[in-house]
Amino acid sequence: MYLPSCTYYVSAPDFSSVSTFLPPTTSCQMTFPYSSNLAQVQPVRELSFRDYGLEHPTKWHYRSNYAPYCSAEEIMHRDYIQPPTRTGMLFKNDTVYSQRGSSNPSCNFYTTVGRNGILPQGFDQFFETAYGISDSSNYEQLTEKSVSTCQSITASEKVSSGQEKESATEKSTVESSGTSATEKNSLSTALRCRKKRCPYTKYQIRELEREFFFNVYINKEKRLQLSRMLNLTDRQVKIWFQNRRMKEKKLSRDRLHFFTGNPLL
């Protein structure tokens, strides 16, 4: 008998063991839209074990090309490999982009570093095809050439920097020498432009001292008279009297300090 509410088919002998709690069958016949000739339905237990892998793992085969000794983490990394780009399609005959079911490569695809020191060993073939490297000797020659070129570039940069420093020092010395020469020239011109000092004669000093002895401050008329008499300018007479007053003030202070002994005076 087939019950619509059940997901599996109950056979006749099993149905005889069910208790009679169901209502008695009526005389009316029920029609179903589906065919009554249904295929044998598998038990739910078998389906659940098959779908969720609850049975022994040896019963079911692997559905991918991963080797049984690969760990789950490595398989996950392999599943997230990016698809080939336009440049990668050029190497479609290589083993990296071949069909998955063709071969089972080793699981340590990204564990070791390749020749270039950055990419894994799986990319060595691309490195070789790009630079034309056939074996390790050629690769060593290429690395030696690159190192030599780097050293030559650094040496040339050092030489150029040294030359620039030398040129800068030469320019600084030239500028300093030029500034010192200009300063010397300016000093020489200033000394040349300065009027030569001409001291007063004994006669002029005696007459000026006599006038200062009588009058410390001299008026303009007397100053003009002395200038005409001593053959001096009005400004020279005026400056001489100013200096003589300052000198007299200093001498009077020294005399007062000598006689009184007070250093504050």
Curated annotation (Swiss-Prot):
Q: Which domain of life is it from?
A: Eukaryota
Q: What is its main location?
A: nucleus
Cellular location(s): Nucleus
Keyword Nucleus recorded: yes
Q: Which UniProt keywords apply?
A: Developmental protein, DNA-binding, Homeobox, Nucleus, Transcription, Transcription regulation
Its cellular-component GO annotations read: nucleoplasm
Q: Which Pfam families match?
A: DUF3528 (PF12045), Homeodomain (PF00046)
Q: Where is this region: Disordered?
A: 158-181
The record ties this protein, via InterPro entries, to: DUF3528, HD, HD_metazoa, Homeobox_CS, Homeodomain-like_sf
Instruction: Write down the DNA-binding region ranges.
Output: 193-252
Function according to Swiss-Prot or TrEMBL: Sequence-specific transcription factor which is part of a developmental regulatory system that provides cells with specific positional identities on the anterior-posterior axis.
Give the family per the record.
Belongs to the Abd-B homeobox family.
Cite the PANTHER family for this sequence: HOMEOBOX PROTEIN HOX-A11-RELATED (PTHR46092), HOMEOBOX PROTEIN HOX-D11 (PTHR46092:SF2)
- What name goes with this protein? Homeobox protein Hox-D11
Which gene name does the record give?
HOXD11
